[in-house]
Design a protein with these regions (language model features):
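Alpha-helical bundle regulatory/interaction domains
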Residues: 1-160, 164-169, 179-184, 198-201, ...
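DNA major-groove recognition helix of helix-turn-helix
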Residues: 176, 188, 225-226, 237
Length: 242
């Protein structure tokens, strides 16, 4: 979950505790202090999040394009971003069933989620509660390896990854849809966009940054930023640059 914020809103990430990096990517906290109900742009990043909004636990499913979230002025969100390859096993369903959706955890877990929400409503620390939910999660090592391949600055092409991971092409497609909510090619596009945001500050121009991130040329970058983020490359960097 990568957000666009007003100048007075705040977003802070905290690293996962030692020993949980294979299950938790990070913890985060967002406070909305802009115009009431002003939309917040959430970029796809290859992850899913568990979010406590003060009333309910929400699962932010895997996005294939930017989502616009309406958040009340003064609202505080506490979230946990799951490590890749963890969500399907933890939640108990393939992630393609949650693609581009925000779903109450109670719809998936029933009374168990209600008990956790009661503890949060009574004032228990959201970070500690969210971490406890993930303590028994079992990562999928081959899906984590795939994510690492595609996320790296020297990203591997999708072609050939199935054999490297010990899958047929068909099995890889199914496993990716279960683990990430979409196929490897979509994951590759999403992680390339995130890589562009990471690498852009190193370059004076957009074309050099695009090539470094793995785009074939500047028009390729422009197509992907429009389709995935709903923004031009320059607008994307202005709103989400690191």
């Amino acid at each position: 979950m990568t957000t666009t914020m007003s100048d007075v809103s705040s977003y802070r990430e905290m690293p996962a505790p030692s020993g949980m990096h294979d299950r938790v990517a990070c913890l985060w906290r967002f406070r909305q202090a802009g115009i009431a109900g002003a939309p917040v742009r959430v970029l796809p990043d290859g992850h899913i999040d568990l979010i406590w909004d003060g009333r309910a636990l929400i699962v932010a499913g895997p996005d294939t394009a930017a989502a616009m979230a309406s958040i009340d002025d003064g609202a505080v969100l506490n979230g946990l971003r799951l490590a890749p390859g963890v969500g399907a096993g933890l939640l108990g369903l393939p992630l393609h069933r949650l693609a581009n959706q925000r779903v109450a955890l109670a719809e998936l877990w029933g009374a168990r989620a209600n008990r956790v929400e009661d503890a949060l409503a009574e004032g228990q620390d959201p970070a500690a509660v969210l971490l406890a939910l993930c303590a028994g999660a079992v990562p999928d090592p081959r899906m984590q390896r795939l994510f690492g391949f595609l996320q790296s600055d020297e990203a591997s092409p999708v072609t050939g990854l199935a054999a490297a991971l010990g899958f047929s092409e068909r099995s890889l497609r199914r496993r990716c849809q279960d683990a990430f909510g979409y196929g490897a090619k979509t994951l590759d596009r999403i992680l390339r966009l995130q890589r562009f945001l990471k690498l852009a500050p190193r370059h004076a121009g957009l074309t050099a940054a695009a090539l470094d991130a793995g785009y074939s040329d500047a028009p390729h970058l422009a197509r992907d930023t429009q389709q995935l983020a709903g923004l031009s490359p320059r607008a994307l960097l202005a709103q989400h640059g690191r």
